């Protein structure tokens, strides 16, 4: 029984299956953690959703910003852009079933036995773990409810960018969503910067990667995240694992076997080598 952590799949089904074949992944015995962004930009978003769903309880995933954007497009809130390559998913005969399954997936995973936390973008240094879990439950509750289109319509935006326990309503949900699915940089006081997408070597000096600020979570739990392909899986402190290595941009799909911290990679087999970026959620 092994636990495997895989970075952003982005519709790269062939690479995902090849990576799982490297370790003879067995869904009856092993567990697969996925950092989110299952869909968009790669060639096989529809088949990725079908495959991941078919693995049932062997999968522990979190939602990413592209997954949320798909939900918004399907709900008629956002526009379908050709570069996302999700048109076949939107018109698939099982689209309703897949979308309803997707919106009921977690936005945060915590395993107390493994001392492991996973979120697509990370955990703000302004939160301790109970606060992160509380905020995740709030987002998950609205996404799985009949009111989810109201949330999807309100989630786009960069403000508020500073945590306060007094935040409420849609503003609180937007902040939490930005932390879990969009965050890269913070100011020294912990405020989110939602504009800079450059690697740390090219970022303004006022900004720090969220993982370089003192963390209330990372002292006790390891944190695994995706989202930030330009990191190339490098430059994080001990106990923080960056797993998005840009497969859909022509890079690699990366897997970490948690049991022995061994990495496995699968080079991109797709012709899609656009410049890295993300939906401005």
UniProtKB/Swiss-Prot annotation:
UniProt keyword Hydrolase, yes or no: yes
Keywords of the record: Hydrolase
Gene3D superfamilies associated with the record: 3.60.21.10
InterPro entries (UniProt xref): ApaH (IPR004617), Calcineurin-like_PHP_ApaH (IPR004843), Metallo-depent_PP-like (IPR029052)
Enzyme class: hydrolase
Any one GO MF annotation of this record: bis(5'-nucleosyl)-tetraphosphatase (symmetrical) activity
Catalytic activity: P(1),P(4)-bis(5'-adenosyl) tetraphosphate + H2O = 2 ADP + 2 H(+)
SUPFAM superfamilies: Metallo-dependent phosphatases
Entry's EC annotation: 3.6.1.41
Function of the protein: Hydrolyzes diadenosine 5',5'''-P1,P4-tetraphosphate to yield ADP.
Family assignment from sequence similarity: Belongs to the Ap4A hydrolase family.
Record's protein name: Bis(5'-nucleosyl)-tetraphosphatase, symmetrical
Source organism per UniProt: Pectobacterium carotovorum subsp. carotovorum (strain PC1)
